[in-house]
Amino acid sequence: MAASSSIVSVAPTASSVPVLPSSCDFSNLREIKKQLLLIAGLTRERGLLHSSKWSAELAFSLPALPLSELQPPPPITEEDAQDMDAYTLAKAYFDVKEYDRAAHFLHGCNSKKAYFLYMYSRYLSGEKKKDDETVDSLGPLEKGQVKNEALRELRVELSKKHQARELDGFGLYLYGVVLRKLDLVKEAIDVFVEATHVLPLHWGAWLELCNLITDKEMLKFLSLPDTWMKEFFLAHIYTELQLIEEALQKYQNLIDVGFSKSSYIVSQIAVAYHNIRDIDKALSIFNELRKQDPYRIENMDTFSNLLYVRSMKSELSYLAHNLCEIDKYRVETCCVIGNYYSLRSQHEKAALYFQRALKLNPRYLGAWTLMGHEYMEMKNTSAAIQAYRHAIEVNKRDYRAWYGLGQTYEILKMPFYCLYYYRRAHQLRPNDSRMLVALGECYEKLNQLVEAKKCYWRAYAVGDVEKMALVKLAKLHEQLTESEQAAQCYIKYIQDIYSCGEIVEHLEESTAFRYLAQYYFKCKLWDEASACAQKCCAFNDTREEGKALLRQILQLRNQGETPSTEIPAPFFLPASLSANNTPTRRVSPLNLSSVTP
């Protein structure tokens, strides 16, 4: 995106919303609390419940204000007084989700608050009808082209108001939402940026803007207001963009300046650790959060993902039952129950609960991705592809959906499609070894072996989660008859798994020892060959080969065959694996500069 397309000049707009000063200074927490309490009330009056809740939770984390410092409610304008009866009635209808009825009684109102509720009621009415049609007529996996029919009319009306500079911060927010829904992304970004300047304390505008930012470069070109709210926005967008180190630093700074009791910040830190697969840390933080806020449901689906990965059935069962008691019809609750059934390998039931979650909120990203995983388990690749595609429609930054699509096309033996989707996943998670190993396998199938080498080595260099990159790289060197490089990879693999004490599948370990035994035997390095052959005897699939090789080594030694001192060996075996401490010749480490990205 060009810089000029994202930088907007903000002109004054007519507004009945009180001026809300919001500098970037955190030194006056009392003033920040006043601002949060005020914006919580203003958003609540307009039916923006999530923004109101966010502001109220953040305000609650700060020290209480004395009576003398509590702000009076905003003054009522002449227009507000004229529309008071209609607004009061319409807001009651709005609160019980009778949106058309609310809009009917607000038609013709002139105050900014009543006008926003009128337009917002029309928008939500269209969204509700669209969702009803999606669920009832087509089902959650056949969303098709169902649209909110009210969007175009709303855009025309809001555009006229915008050109006349008659939209306040809330009106700009709604205009941006309408533009985003119509896929007018560039225009939506400009309007949301304008909304943050006009009303910087409205979290909803920041959040909508966050959903449209695709990379860090795009973020640099935004002309954002210099406000303390910007710090919360940056922490959130860094988490979304997988810039976890920067995100954690931002959240730590916010804790240091006085928001240490904020459950929102604590939950975001847990999500950040989840994103970098620091499972122990994330679990610990979520458990602490549950103690502080036992009835919290937000982010509990992420908590359940961690319990799922660790196969903690009893803890996941307890969480599912607990959330059912709190609110069984929340999206997060359905996802937690789905994860519970998935862990028990009841994939049909799991998919059913993810579908229930999508009936409650068709734009809930986690449910689409998890349902795709379940269809993969059920070998229903076409349904899995649809689910993953819906997840990408909701959020193009979801690497799990791109990775899932790569896996489905790998099953369908379509390597070029597979390569495309794995590349997209890798772009979003450049330091995730799983994406790199998947890319390497794709390149290998396409006979692009140099690229495959790069991917496997890079996967090892960034921290191989599954401990498979070196094995795959070694097998690739075997295939290319690069015996010394293959041996070095196998030795490094063995050193790694023995140094961390991790239990691995026997097939991988035995494969490494079998190759090394044969390699050292060819090099006439009897001690090393004997040590590896003895290790082969510990595994069923290599036991006979190991015994045969030991007999050959013994026979050659009895015949007086001397070990070689000229043929190079990769480097020493770990001391615990060597038959003795007899030194062997060591060559320079493997030169991987030619295959390192």
Swiss-Prot record:
UniProt organism field: Bos taurus
Protein name in UniProt: Cell division cycle protein 23 homolog
GO biological process: anaphase-promoting complex-dependent catabolic process; cell division; positive regulation of mitotic metaphase/anaphase transition; protein branched polyubiquitination; protein K11-linked ubiquitination; protein K48-linked ubiquitination; protein ubiquitination
Pathway membership: Protein modification; protein ubiquitination
Positions of transmembrane segments: none
TPR repeats: from-to residues: 27-63, 73-112, 114-144, 169-200, 229-259, 263-293, 297-327, 331-361, 366-395, 400-432, 433-466, 468-500, 504-540
Known partners and oligomeric status: The mammalian APC/C is composed at least of 14 distinct subunits ANAPC1, ANAPC2, CDC27/APC3, ANAPC4, ANAPC5, CDC16/APC6, ANAPC7, CDC23/APC8, ANAPC10, ANAPC11, CDC26/APC12, ANAPC13, ANAPC15 and ANAPC16 that assemble into a complex of at least 19 chains with a combined molecular mass of around 1.2 MDa; APC/C interacts with FZR1 and FBXO5. Interacts with FBXO43; the interaction is direct.
Protein family membership: Belongs to the APC8/CDC23 family.
GO cellular component labels: anaphase-promoting complex
Cross-link (Glycyl lysine isopeptide (Lys-Gly) (interchain with G-Cter in SUMO2)) at residue(s): K147
Residues modified to Phosphothreonine: T562, T565, T582, T596
SUPFAM superfamilies xrefs: TPR-like
Mod. after translation: Phosphorylated. Phosphorylation on Thr-562 occurs specifically during mitosis.
Residue numbers carrying Phosphotyrosine: Y273
N-acetylalanine: residues carrying this PTM: A2
Modified residues (Phosphoserine): S578, S588, S593
Native organism taxonomy: Eukaryota, Metazoa, Chordata, Craniata, Vertebrata
Keyword line: Acetylation, Cell cycle, Cell division, Isopeptide bond, Mitosis, Phosphoprotein, Repeat, TPR repeat, Ubl conjugation, Ubl conjugation pathway
InterPro entries linked: APC8 (IPR007192), TPR-like_helical_dom_sf (IPR011990), TPR_rpt (IPR019734)
Pfam families membership: ANAPC8, TPR_11, TPR_8
Function of the protein: Component of the anaphase promoting complex/cyclosome (APC/C), a cell cycle-regulated E3 ubiquitin ligase that controls progression through mitosis and the G1 phase of the cell cycle. The APC/C complex acts by mediating ubiquitination and subsequent degradation of target proteins: it mainly mediates the formation of 'Lys-11'-linked polyubiquitin chains and, to a lower extent, the formation of 'Lys-48'- and 'Lys-63'-linked polyubiquitin chains. The APC/C complex catalyzes assembly of branched 'Lys-11'-/'Lys-48'-linked branched ubiquitin chains on target proteins.
